[in-house]
């Protein structure tokens, strides 16, 4: 699990190299805190601009039902997928930055349980499915290897 910043990705690449040197199977890379989605309501069809990270203007259009959403890459994005590709390990997915996960932990009700159809729950579920697929595969293993 990594965050999208270069210093975290460097640590992840080192960890992958270390695991490979010990012949420890690597399930894959997960990018955590990958984008923060702001949501709101406005006049249907209106367009406004949000000042994103790095001073980048992001145009947002309000949908017919009056809702809008914009995802800001606060900590960058795509680094997990790029690291997985460069190191030849599977990319398991990206988990959004969600303050509700922290609040849920403090309140004793995990965000995934409280909001099973939410963005975070769907992202976690997609990652978990890939991990389950990996674990359920018949691994050709001769047991432990002394190195």
Language model feature labels by segment:
Residues 1-16:
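Conserved Switch II/interswitch segment of TRAFAC-class P-loop GTPases
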Residues 16-147:
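C-terminal lobe/tail of nucleotide-utilizing enzymes
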């Amino acid at each position: 699990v990594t965050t999208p910043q270069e210093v975290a990705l460097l640590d992840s690449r080192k960890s992958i190299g270390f695991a490979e040197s010990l012949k420890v199977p690597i399930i894959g890379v997960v990018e955590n805190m990958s984008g923060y989605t702001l949501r709101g309501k406005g006049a249907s069809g209106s367009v406004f601009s949000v000042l994103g990270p790095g001073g980048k203007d992001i145009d947002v259009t309000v949908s017919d039902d009056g809702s809008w959403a914009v995802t800001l890459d606060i900590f960058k994005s795509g680094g997990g997928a790029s690291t997985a590709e460069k190191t030849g390990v599977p990319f398991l997915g990206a988990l959004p930055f969600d303050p509700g996960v922290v609040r849920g932990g403090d309140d004793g009700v995990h965000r995934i349980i409280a909001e099973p159809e939410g963005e975070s729950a769907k992202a976690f579920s997609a990652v978990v499915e890939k991990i389950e697929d990996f674990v359920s595969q018949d691994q050709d293993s001769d047991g432990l290897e002394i190195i």
